[in-house]
Protein backbone atom coordinates (compact mmCIF):
# COMPACT_ATOMS: atom_id res chain seq x y z
CA UNK A 1 0.00 0.00 0.00
CA UNK A 2 1.43 3.32 -1.07
CA UNK A 3 1.33 6.20 1.39
CA UNK A 4 -0.48 9.15 -0.16
CA UNK A 5 -0.14 11.45 2.88
CA UNK A 6 2.68 14.00 2.94
CA UNK A 7 5.73 13.52 5.17
CA UNK A 8 5.07 14.59 8.79
CA UNK A 9 1.56 13.20 9.18
CA UNK A 10 1.27 10.13 11.35
CA UNK A 11 0.22 8.76 14.74
CA UNK A 12 1.82 8.96 18.13
CA UNK A 13 1.30 8.18 21.76
CA UNK A 14 0.31 10.90 24.17
CA UNK A 15 3.86 11.75 25.21
CA UNK A 16 5.29 11.56 21.65
CA UNK A 17 7.76 8.84 22.70
CA UNK A 18 6.53 6.31 20.06
CA UNK A 19 5.64 7.68 16.64
CA UNK A 20 4.84 6.25 13.24
CA UNK A 21 5.41 8.85 10.54
CA UNK A 22 3.45 9.16 7.32
CA UNK A 23 0.36 7.34 8.62
CA UNK A 24 -2.97 9.22 8.31
CA UNK A 25 -5.85 8.77 10.75
CA UNK A 26 -7.87 6.73 8.27
CA UNK A 27 -5.51 3.77 8.65
CA UNK A 28 -6.75 2.71 12.09
CA UNK A 29 -7.97 -0.86 12.61
CA UNK A 30 -5.98 -2.03 9.57
CA UNK A 31 -2.88 -4.07 8.92
CA UNK A 32 -0.48 -2.06 6.80
CA UNK A 33 3.20 -2.29 5.82
CA UNK A 34 5.33 0.50 7.21
CA UNK A 35 9.03 1.02 6.43
CA UNK A 36 11.21 0.28 9.41
CA UNK A 37 12.80 3.74 9.29
CA UNK A 38 9.40 5.45 9.81
CA UNK A 39 8.90 3.85 13.27
CA UNK A 40 10.61 6.23 15.70
CA UNK A 41 11.24 5.60 19.41
CA UNK A 42 12.70 8.51 21.37
CA UNK A 43 13.44 6.93 24.75
CA UNK A 44 14.12 3.26 24.28
CA UNK A 45 13.93 2.51 27.99
CA UNK A 46 10.23 3.59 28.09
CA UNK A 47 9.31 0.97 25.48
CA UNK A 48 7.22 -2.00 26.59
CA UNK A 49 6.21 -5.07 24.51
CA UNK A 50 3.26 -7.28 25.31
CA UNK A 51 3.10 -10.59 23.42
CA UNK A 52 -0.25 -11.83 22.08
CA UNK A 53 -1.36 -14.50 19.60
CA UNK A 54 0.83 -14.20 16.48
CA UNK A 55 1.60 -10.59 17.29
CA UNK A 56 3.37 -8.28 19.73
CA UNK A 57 1.77 -5.11 21.15
CA UNK A 58 4.02 -2.06 21.52
CA UNK A 59 3.20 0.26 24.46
CA UNK A 60 4.75 3.31 26.11
CA UNK A 61 5.39 3.31 29.83
CA UNK A 62 5.51 7.10 29.84
CA UNK A 63 1.84 7.56 28.99
CA UNK A 64 0.69 3.89 29.43
CA UNK A 65 -0.85 3.73 25.95
CA UNK A 66 -0.64 0.95 23.36
CA UNK A 67 -0.93 2.44 19.90
CA UNK A 68 0.11 -0.42 17.56
CA UNK A 69 0.81 -4.13 17.24
CA UNK A 70 3.50 -5.81 15.15
CA UNK A 71 2.94 -9.10 13.36
CA UNK A 72 5.15 -11.81 14.80
CA UNK A 73 7.07 -12.05 18.03
CA UNK A 74 9.69 -9.40 18.75
CA UNK A 75 12.19 -9.11 21.58
CA UNK A 76 13.62 -6.02 23.22
CA UNK A 77 17.33 -6.00 22.38
CA UNK A 78 20.15 -3.80 23.52
CA UNK A 79 20.35 -2.08 20.12
CA UNK A 80 17.12 -0.33 18.99
CA UNK A 81 17.93 -0.81 15.28
CA UNK A 82 17.69 -4.60 15.76
CA UNK A 83 14.16 -4.44 17.13
CA UNK A 84 12.62 -4.91 13.69
CA UNK A 85 14.44 -7.41 11.45
CA UNK A 86 12.58 -6.77 8.19
CA UNK A 87 12.72 -3.63 6.08
CA UNK A 88 8.93 -3.38 5.79
CA UNK A 89 7.12 -4.09 9.06
CA UNK A 90 3.44 -5.13 9.09
CA UNK A 91 1.63 -3.18 11.86
CA UNK A 92 -1.92 -2.77 13.19
CA UNK A 93 -3.05 0.71 14.39
CA UNK A 94 -5.26 0.96 17.49
CA UNK A 95 -7.86 3.63 18.30
CA UNK A 96 -5.71 4.98 21.15
CA UNK A 97 -3.27 6.37 18.65
CA UNK A 98 -3.32 10.16 18.48
CA UNK A 99 -2.81 12.21 15.39
CA UNK A 100 0.67 13.61 15.38
CA UNK A 101 -0.27 16.98 13.94
CA UNK A 102 -2.94 17.59 16.61
CA UNK A 103 -0.56 16.72 19.46
CA UNK A 104 2.09 19.15 18.22
CA UNK A 105 -0.46 21.92 17.87
CA UNK A 106 -2.13 21.43 21.29
CA UNK A 107 0.70 20.70 23.72
CA UNK A 108 4.14 22.20 24.32
CA UNK A 109 7.03 20.00 23.23
CA UNK A 110 10.42 19.97 24.86
CA UNK A 111 13.79 20.11 23.12
CA UNK A 112 13.87 16.31 23.02
CA UNK A 113 10.67 16.24 20.96
CA UNK A 114 8.49 14.71 23.71
CA UNK A 115 6.05 15.95 26.32
CA UNK A 116 8.11 15.95 29.51
CA UNK A 117 5.13 16.99 31.67
CA UNK A 118 3.32 13.70 31.02
CA UNK A 119 6.46 11.70 31.54
CA UNK A 120 7.15 13.39 34.88
CA UNK A 121 3.53 12.97 36.00
CA UNK A 122 3.15 9.32 35.01
CA UNK A 123 6.60 7.75 35.43
CA UNK A 124 9.85 9.48 36.23
CA UNK A 125 12.53 7.89 34.05
CA UNK A 126 15.92 7.12 35.51
CA UNK A 127 18.84 9.25 34.46
CA UNK A 128 21.01 6.33 33.40
CA UNK A 129 18.29 5.07 31.04
CA UNK A 130 17.88 8.51 29.50
CA UNK A 131 21.68 8.85 29.19
CA UNK A 132 21.95 5.42 27.53
CA UNK A 133 19.16 6.23 25.10
CA UNK A 134 20.73 9.50 24.10
CA UNK A 135 24.22 7.98 23.91
CA UNK A 136 22.95 5.40 21.43
CA UNK A 137 21.58 8.17 19.23
CA UNK A 138 24.73 10.25 19.58
CA UNK A 139 26.98 7.28 18.92
CA UNK A 140 25.09 6.56 15.74
CA UNK A 141 25.60 10.11 14.52
CA UNK A 142 29.22 10.08 15.60
CA UNK A 143 29.82 6.80 13.78
CA UNK A 144 28.23 8.14 10.61
CA UNK A 145 30.26 11.34 10.81
CA UNK A 146 33.48 9.44 11.45
CA UNK A 147 32.83 7.18 8.47
CA UNK A 148 32.29 10.19 6.25
CA UNK A 149 35.47 11.78 7.53
CA UNK A 150 37.41 8.57 6.98
CA UNK A 151 36.13 8.27 3.42
CA UNK A 152 37.07 11.85 2.63
CA UNK A 153 40.44 11.46 4.34
CA UNK A 154 41.05 8.18 2.53
CA UNK A 155 40.37 9.80 -0.84
CA UNK A 156 42.62 12.72 0.11
CA UNK A 157 45.34 10.34 1.20
CA UNK A 158 44.98 8.38 -2.03
CA UNK A 159 45.41 11.54 -4.09
CA UNK A 160 48.38 12.68 -2.04
CA UNK A 161 49.93 9.22 -2.29
CA UNK A 162 49.49 9.21 -6.06
CA UNK A 163 51.05 12.66 -6.29
CA UNK A 164 53.97 11.53 -4.13
CA UNK A 165 54.53 8.41 -6.21
CA UNK A 166 54.33 10.42 -9.43
CA UNK A 167 56.90 12.86 -8.07
CA UNK A 168 59.19 10.01 -7.05
CA UNK A 169 58.89 8.46 -10.50
CA UNK A 170 59.78 11.76 -12.18
CA UNK A 171 62.78 12.16 -9.88
CA UNK A 172 63.94 8.63 -10.64
CA UNK A 173 63.59 9.15 -14.39
CA UNK A 174 65.57 12.39 -14.17
CA UNK A 175 68.26 10.66 -12.10
CA UNK A 176 68.42 7.75 -14.55
CA UNK A 177 68.74 10.13 -17.52
CA UNK A 178 71.53 12.06 -15.81
CA UNK A 179 73.29 8.81 -14.92
CA UNK A 180 73.14 7.61 -18.53
CA UNK A 181 74.51 10.93 -19.76
CA UNK A 182 77.41 10.73 -17.29
CA UNK A 183 78.11 7.14 -18.34
CA UNK A 184 78.14 8.06 -22.04
CA UNK A 185 80.45 11.01 -21.34
CA UNK A 186 82.86 8.79 -19.40
CA UNK A 187 82.74 6.14 -22.13
CA UNK A 188 83.54 8.69 -24.84
CA UNK A 189 86.42 10.13 -22.81
CA UNK A 190 87.82 6.63 -22.20
CA UNK A 191 87.56 5.76 -25.90
CA UNK A 192 89.35 8.98 -26.80
CA UNK A 193 92.06 8.32 -24.21
CA UNK A 194 92.54 4.72 -25.37
CA UNK A 195 92.71 5.84 -29.00
CA UNK A 196 95.29 8.49 -28.11
CA UNK A 197 97.40 5.95 -26.22
CA UNK A 198 97.07 3.45 -29.07
CA UNK A 199 98.11 6.06 -31.66
CA UNK A 200 101.08 7.10 -29.53
CA UNK A 201 102.13 3.46 -29.10
CA UNK A 202 102.01 3.00 -32.87
CA UNK A 203 103.78 6.28 -33.59
CA UNK A 204 106.63 5.81 -31.12
CA UNK A 205 108.01 2.54 -32.62
CA UNK A 206 107.64 4.06 -36.07
CA UNK A 207 109.72 7.06 -35.09
CA UNK A 208 112.32 4.88 -33.48
CA UNK A 209 112.43 2.61 -36.55
CA UNK A 210 112.83 5.67 -38.78
CA UNK A 211 115.71 6.83 -36.65
CA UNK A 212 117.27 3.37 -36.80
CA UNK A 213 116.80 3.27 -40.58
CA UNK A 214 118.47 6.66 -40.85
CA UNK A 215 121.42 5.41 -38.79
CA UNK A 216 121.66 2.28 -40.95
CA UNK A 217 121.51 4.41 -44.08
CA UNK A 218 124.40 6.55 -42.80
CA UNK A 219 126.39 3.45 -41.90
CA UNK A 220 125.67 1.83 -45.27
CA UNK A 221 126.62 5.03 -47.07
CA UNK A 222 129.89 5.17 -45.20
CA UNK A 223 130.52 1.52 -45.97
CA UNK A 224 129.81 2.04 -49.66
CA UNK A 225 132.23 4.97 -49.66
CA UNK A 226 134.87 2.81 -48.02
CA UNK A 227 134.26 0.07 -50.57
CA UNK A 228 134.80 2.48 -53.43
CA UNK A 229 138.06 3.67 -51.92
CA UNK A 230 139.34 0.19 -51.05
CA UNK A 231 141.28 -2.04 -53.39
CA UNK A 232 139.27 -4.21 -55.77
CA UNK A 233 138.51 -7.77 -54.71
CA UNK A 234 139.27 -10.34 -57.37
CA UNK A 235 139.36 -13.66 -55.55
CA UNK A 236 136.52 -15.75 -54.23
CA UNK A 237 137.45 -18.37 -51.68
CA UNK A 238 134.34 -20.56 -51.57
CA UNK A 239 133.52 -22.81 -54.49
CA UNK A 240 129.79 -23.52 -54.22
CA UNK A 241 127.18 -21.67 -56.29
CA UNK A 242 125.43 -18.93 -54.31
CA UNK A 243 122.75 -16.53 -55.35
CA UNK A 244 124.05 -12.98 -55.01
CA UNK A 245 121.74 -10.00 -54.42
CA UNK A 246 122.16 -7.01 -56.69
CA UNK A 247 121.17 -3.49 -55.66
CA UNK A 248 121.99 0.00 -56.85
CA UNK A 249 121.45 1.33 -53.35
CA UNK A 250 123.36 -0.06 -50.39
CA UNK A 251 121.32 -1.55 -47.57
CA UNK A 252 118.51 -2.97 -49.80
CA UNK A 253 118.04 -6.74 -49.98
CA UNK A 254 115.65 -8.99 -51.84
CA UNK A 255 114.38 -12.53 -51.58
CA UNK A 256 114.81 -13.03 -55.36
CA UNK A 257 118.25 -11.58 -56.11
CA UNK A 258 118.41 -12.24 -59.84
CA UNK A 259 115.18 -10.41 -60.62
CA UNK A 260 113.73 -7.01 -59.93
CA UNK A 261 111.37 -8.01 -57.15
CA UNK A 262 108.12 -6.37 -56.10
CA UNK A 263 109.78 -4.90 -53.00
CA UNK A 264 112.47 -3.26 -55.17
CA UNK A 265 109.81 -1.68 -57.40
CA UNK A 266 107.93 -0.39 -54.34
CA UNK A 267 111.08 1.07 -52.80
CA UNK A 268 112.28 2.53 -56.15
CA UNK A 269 109.20 3.69 -58.10
CA UNK A 270 111.27 5.97 -60.38
CA UNK A 271 113.78 3.28 -61.30
CA UNK A 272 113.58 1.84 -64.80
CA UNK A 273 115.72 -1.16 -65.64
CA UNK A 274 117.76 -0.79 -68.81
CA UNK A 275 118.63 -3.59 -71.17
CA UNK A 276 122.33 -3.27 -70.28
CA UNK A 277 121.66 -3.69 -66.58
CA UNK A 278 119.41 -6.67 -67.25
CA UNK A 279 122.09 -8.25 -69.43
CA UNK A 280 124.67 -7.62 -66.71
CA UNK A 281 122.42 -9.30 -64.16
CA UNK A 282 121.88 -12.28 -66.45
CA UNK A 283 125.61 -12.57 -66.99
CA UNK A 284 126.15 -12.24 -63.27
CA UNK A 285 123.59 -14.96 -62.52
CA UNK A 286 125.63 -17.41 -64.64
CA UNK A 287 128.76 -16.79 -62.55
CA UNK A 288 130.05 -20.02 -60.97
CA UNK A 289 132.99 -20.95 -58.86
CA UNK A 290 135.29 -23.86 -59.16
CA UNK A 291 135.49 -26.72 -56.72
CA UNK A 292 138.07 -27.25 -54.00
CA UNK A 293 139.77 -30.05 -55.91
CA UNK A 294 140.26 -27.89 -59.00
CA UNK A 295 141.69 -25.04 -56.94
CA UNK A 296 144.00 -27.41 -55.13
CA UNK A 297 145.11 -29.01 -58.34
CA UNK A 298 145.83 -25.67 -59.98
CA UNK A 299 147.71 -24.49 -56.94
CA UNK A 300 149.94 -27.57 -56.86
CA UNK A 301 150.60 -27.42 -60.57
CA UNK A 302 151.63 -23.80 -60.39
CA UNK A 303 153.97 -24.57 -57.52
CA UNK A 304 155.61 -27.33 -59.54
CA UNK A 305 155.96 -25.09 -62.57
CA UNK A 306 157.45 -22.39 -60.40
CA UNK A 307 160.05 -24.75 -59.02
CA UNK A 308 161.04 -25.98 -62.47
CA UNK A 309 161.07 -22.87 -64.55
CA UNK A 310 161.21 -20.12 -61.99
CA UNK A 311 158.56 -18.23 -63.85
CA UNK A 312 155.87 -16.24 -62.13
CA UNK A 313 153.17 -18.25 -60.42
CA UNK A 314 149.86 -18.21 -62.30
CA UNK A 315 146.72 -19.97 -61.20
CA UNK A 316 144.50 -21.75 -63.64
CA UNK A 317 141.55 -19.78 -62.31
CA UNK A 318 140.26 -17.59 -65.10
CA UNK A 319 140.88 -13.91 -64.34
CA UNK A 320 139.26 -11.29 -66.57
CA UNK A 321 141.04 -8.40 -68.26
CA UNK A 322 141.56 -4.95 -66.74
CA UNK A 323 138.36 -3.49 -68.17
CA UNK A 324 136.37 -6.50 -67.08
CA UNK A 325 138.10 -6.30 -63.69
CA UNK A 326 136.86 -2.76 -63.16
CA UNK A 327 133.32 -3.66 -64.23
CA UNK A 328 133.29 -6.83 -62.12
CA UNK A 329 134.76 -4.98 -59.13
CA UNK A 330 132.05 -2.34 -59.24
CA UNK A 331 129.40 -5.05 -59.39
CA UNK A 332 130.95 -7.06 -56.58
CA UNK A 333 130.95 -3.91 -54.47
CA UNK A 334 127.19 -3.65 -55.02
CA UNK A 335 126.45 -7.33 -54.32
CA UNK A 336 125.33 -8.45 -50.86
CA UNK A 337 124.11 -11.73 -49.42
CA UNK A 338 120.43 -11.63 -48.26
CA UNK A 339 119.55 -13.82 -45.31
CA UNK A 340 116.17 -13.14 -43.69
CA UNK A 341 116.10 -9.76 -41.94
CA UNK A 342 119.87 -9.72 -41.12
CA UNK A 343 121.87 -8.65 -44.23
CA UNK A 344 125.50 -9.59 -44.55
CA UNK A 345 127.89 -7.77 -46.89
CA UNK A 346 130.34 -9.84 -48.80
CA UNK A 347 133.15 -7.47 -47.93
CA UNK A 348 132.48 -7.98 -44.19
CA UNK A 349 133.57 -11.61 -44.45
CA UNK A 350 137.11 -12.53 -43.51
CA UNK A 351 137.29 -14.34 -46.85
CA UNK A 352 138.08 -11.11 -48.66
CA UNK A 353 141.42 -9.62 -47.81
CA UNK A 354 143.23 -6.60 -49.15
CA UNK A 355 145.30 -7.79 -52.10
CA UNK A 356 147.35 -5.91 -54.58
CA UNK A 357 145.49 -4.63 -57.67
CA UNK A 358 147.56 -6.78 -60.00
CA UNK A 359 145.64 -8.79 -62.59
CA UNK A 360 147.65 -11.98 -62.02
CA UNK A 361 149.28 -13.81 -59.13
CA UNK A 362 152.89 -13.04 -59.98
CA UNK A 363 154.42 -14.04 -56.68
CA UNK A 364 153.75 -16.00 -53.53
CA UNK A 365 153.26 -12.81 -51.55
CA UNK A 366 150.13 -12.00 -53.53
CA UNK A 367 148.61 -15.39 -52.64
CA UNK A 368 149.18 -15.91 -48.94
CA UNK A 369 146.67 -18.70 -48.21
CA UNK A 370 147.37 -22.39 -48.50
CA UNK A 371 144.87 -24.80 -50.13
CA UNK A 372 143.62 -25.87 -46.70
CA UNK A 373 142.86 -22.28 -45.75
CA UNK A 374 140.35 -22.07 -48.60
CA UNK A 375 138.38 -24.97 -47.13
CA UNK A 376 138.50 -23.43 -43.65
CA UNK A 377 137.30 -20.11 -44.94
CA UNK A 378 134.53 -21.80 -46.87
CA UNK A 379 133.39 -23.68 -43.75
CA UNK A 380 133.52 -20.53 -41.67
CA UNK A 381 131.48 -18.71 -44.30
CA UNK A 382 128.86 -21.48 -44.33
CA UNK A 383 128.67 -21.37 -40.52
CA UNK A 384 128.20 -17.60 -40.65
CA UNK A 385 125.37 -18.02 -43.15
CA UNK A 386 123.70 -20.63 -40.95
CA UNK A 387 123.99 -18.40 -37.87
CA UNK A 388 122.62 -15.47 -39.82
CA UNK A 389 119.70 -17.58 -41.02
CA UNK A 390 118.96 -18.83 -37.50
CA UNK A 391 119.22 -15.29 -36.18
CA UNK A 392 116.76 -13.97 -38.78
CA UNK A 393 114.34 -16.84 -38.08
CA UNK A 394 114.51 -16.21 -34.33
CA UNK A 395 113.81 -12.51 -34.87
CA UNK A 396 110.80 -13.36 -37.03
CA UNK A 397 109.53 -15.87 -34.45
CA UNK A 398 109.88 -13.34 -31.62
CA UNK A 399 108.02 -10.74 -33.67
CA UNK A 400 105.13 -13.23 -34.02
CA UNK A 401 104.97 -13.69 -30.24
CA UNK A 402 106.78 -17.02 -29.76
CA UNK A 403 109.18 -17.65 -26.88
CA UNK A 404 112.41 -19.41 -27.85
CA UNK A 405 114.51 -21.71 -25.72
CA UNK A 406 117.43 -19.30 -25.96
CA UNK A 407 115.29 -16.60 -24.42
CA UNK A 408 114.49 -18.86 -21.47
CA UNK A 409 118.18 -19.69 -20.90
CA UNK A 410 120.13 -16.60 -21.86
CA UNK A 411 117.80 -13.63 -22.22
CA UNK A 412 117.46 -11.43 -19.15
CA UNK A 413 114.55 -9.48 -20.63
CA UNK A 414 112.28 -12.53 -20.76
CA UNK A 415 108.65 -11.86 -21.55
CA UNK A 416 105.97 -14.57 -21.59
CA UNK A 417 103.95 -15.41 -24.66
CA UNK A 418 100.89 -13.44 -23.59
CA UNK A 419 102.89 -10.31 -22.83
CA UNK A 420 104.78 -10.60 -26.13
CA UNK A 421 101.55 -11.05 -28.04
CA UNK A 422 99.93 -8.05 -26.34
CA UNK A 423 103.04 -5.95 -26.96
CA UNK A 424 103.59 -6.86 -30.64
CA UNK A 425 101.20 -9.37 -32.15
CA UNK A 426 97.89 -7.59 -31.59
CA UNK A 427 99.10 -4.48 -33.44
CA UNK A 428 99.71 -6.53 -36.56
CA UNK A 429 96.17 -7.92 -36.35
CA UNK A 430 94.72 -4.40 -36.32
Swiss-Prot record:
<keyword id="KW-0749">Sporulation</keyword>
<dbReference type="GO" id="GO:0031931">
    <property type="term" value="C:TORC1 complex"/>
</dbReference>
<feature type="modified residue" description="Phosphoserine">
    <location>
        <position position="399"/>
    </location>
</feature>
<keyword id="KW-0597">Phosphoprotein</keyword>
<dbReference type="GO" id="GO:0030435">
    <property type="term" value="P:sporulation resulting in formation of a cellular spore"/>
</dbReference>
<comment type="function">
    <text>Component of TORC1, which regulates multiple cellular processes to control cell growth in response to environmental signals. Tor2 is essential for growth. Nutrient limitation and environmental stress signals cause inactivation of TORC1. Active TORC1 positively controls cell growth and ribosome biogenesis by regulating ribosomal protein gene expression. TORC1 negatively controls G1 cell-cycle arrest, sexual development and amino acid uptake.</text>
</comment>
<feature type="modified residue" description="Phosphoserine">
    <location>
        <position position="204"/>
    </location>
</feature>
<protein>
    <recommendedName>
        <fullName>Target of rapamycin complex 1 subunit toc1</fullName>
    </recommendedName>
</protein>
<dbReference type="GO" id="GO:0051321">
    <property type="term" value="P:meiotic cell cycle"/>
</dbReference>
<comment type="subunit">
    <text>The target of rapamycin complex 1 (TORC1) is composed of at least mip1, pop3/wat1, tco89, toc1 and tor2.</text>
</comment>
<keyword id="KW-0963">Cytoplasm</keyword>
<keyword id="KW-0469">Meiosis</keyword>
<keyword id="KW-0131">Cell cycle</keyword>
<dbReference type="GO" id="GO:0005829">
    <property type="term" value="C:cytosol"/>
</dbReference>
<dbReference type="GO" id="GO:0038202">
    <property type="term" value="P:TORC1 signaling"/>
</dbReference>
